[in-house]
Amino acid sequence: MNKKSIRDVDLKGKRVFCRVDFNVPMKEGKITDETRIRAALPTIQYLVEQGAKVILASHLGRPKGQVVEELRLTPVAARLGELLGKDVKKADEAFGPVAQEMVAAMNEGDVLVLENVRFYAGEEKNDAELAKEFAALADIFVNDAFGAAHRAHASTAGIADYLPAVSGLLMEKELDVLGKALSNPDRPFTAIIGGAKVKDKIGVIRHLLDKVDNLIIGGGLAYTFVKALGHEIGLSLCEDDKIELAKEFMQLAKEKGVNFYMPVDVVITEEFSETATTKIVGIDSIPSNWEGVDIGPKTREIYADVIKNSKLVVWNGPMGVFEMTPFSQGTKAVGQALADAEGTYSVIGGGDSAAAVEKFGMADKMSHISTGGGASLEFMEGKELPGVVCLNDK
C-alpha cells in the first residue's frame, strides 16, 4: 500500500483522532455482534502502546443529524474497556468544549470515545466547519474505518484537510489484501459473484472480467443471465432491463478468455418459507409458477471444483436465500469448498457473504473477511475510496 500507516509516524504524546467502525448491531441497549469492535483492537492497542492519546470516533446507525438516545456509543465504550482491560472514557459530544476538556485531561495511552458523529448533520455532508472542529481535538488523523471508506464524510475524509492523515492497521490490511487481488493476483484467480441484483454488481463484474480467470455467477442475479440465454425462468428474480447487459458480459468473457460459470441446475419453490417444498430442476426446466431460490447440487459440485483448483478466490454475494434453511445449501457449499480448499487464498467481500460464513461457522477457515460490504464492492469496481484517497502518500 502506498499510503502512510500508523507505523510510519511518531505517535508518542500525540493526540490521535482515530476514525473506527463501531457500527455494531444493538438490541435493547445490548451489542449483539461485536466483530467490528474486535477488528479495531489491534490499531487501538498499537496506539496505546506507542503512548498516543487515543480519541476514537465512529457512527452508529442512522440518526440523520440528530441525537437519538439509543444510538449513543456508551455501551460500545463500556464493552471496549472490557476488551482492552482498561478504563475507557466516553464523551457525550463529538467536539466542542466538553470534548476538548476531556482531551486536555488525557495522559499518554489513555482512550476516549467521542459521541456518535452522525448526531451532527454536517457529518454526512462532509461539512468543512465540522471537520475543523474534529481536527481541533487532535494532532494526527488515523482512518481505520474501512467499512466507511467509500463515504466522503467529515470524520472519514474532510478532517484530513486539516491534519496529517494515515491509515490504521485494519485499513492497511484491507487495502493490501484487496489491492494485491486486483493488481497482482495469484492464479488461477476466481471471482464468485452472487446476491439479488445485477444492477448492484455491474461495476464489479465489468472490472473483474479484465482480471480473473474464472467468473462464477449465483444468487438472484443469475436468473437474468439464464433468461439472456433464452430460457424461461418462471417467477424467478429478473431484471428485464439488464438482459442485454448480461449477454454483453457473457460475450466479453468469451473474448477475454474468462471461463464463465452459471448454474446448470437450481432449487425451485412455490413458496418463500422455512418449511417450503422444493424441487431440483435443470436450468432450462423452471415451471412458470415456480421460482429459483438456490443453486442445485450439480452446480455446487462444478463450483466447488473450480474453487479447489484456484489459488485466489474473491467471493461477493450469496448463491441463494441462505437465511432460510431450504434455500441455504448452495451458499453453504461454496463456503465449505473455500474452507476445504488447500493452498487457496479466500477473500470474503463483506456484507452478506461475510454474514453467511459466520452463520455456517466457517469464518475462521477463510483467509480474509473484509469488514466493508459497500467499501470492498466499490474497491473491486476499481473506484477510488474517499477515506483512502485523503491519506498521506508514503
UniProtKB/Swiss-Prot annotation:
Q: What class of enzyme is it?
A: transferase
Residues the record lists as binding ATP: K201, G292, E323, G350, G351, D352, S353
Q: Which residues carry this modification: Phosphothreonine?
A: T299
Q: Where in the cell is it found?
A: Cytoplasm
Listed under catalytic activity are:
(2R)-3-phosphoglycerate + ATP = (2R)-3-phospho-glyceroyl phosphate + ADP
Per the UniProt entry, the Enzyme Commission number(s) are 2.7.2.3
Checking CDD domains in the record gives: Phosphoglycerate_kinase
InterPro entries (UniProt xref): Phosphoglycerate_kinase, Phosphoglycerate_kinase_CS, Phosphoglycerate_kinase_N, Phosphoglycerate_kinase_sf
Q: Which positions carry Phosphoserine?
A: S183
Molecular function, one GO term: ATP binding
Cellular compartments per GO CC:
cytosol
Query: Which key words tag this protein in UniProt?
Result: ATP-binding, Cytoplasm, Glycolysis, Kinase, Nucleotide-binding, Phosphoprotein, Transferase
Transmembrane feature ranges:
none
Q: Which domain of life is it from?
A: Bacteria
Output the GO biological process annotations, alphabetical, semicolon-separated.
gluconeogenesis; glycolytic process
Pathway(s) of this molecule: Carbohydrate degradation; glycolysis; pyruvate from D-glyceraldehyde 3-phosphate: step 2/5
UniProt: substrate binding residues: D21, F22, N23, R36, H59, L60, G61, R62, R118, R151
Chief location of this protein? cytoplasm
Name the family.
Belongs to the phosphoglycerate kinase family.
| Record text on subunit structure and interactions | Monomer.
PANTHER family in the cross-refs: PHOSPHOGLYCERATE KINASE, PHOSPHOGLYCERATE KINASE 1, CHLOROPLASTIC-RELATED
Q: What is this protein called?
A: Phosphoglycerate kinase
Species assigned in the record: Bacillus cereus (strain Q1)
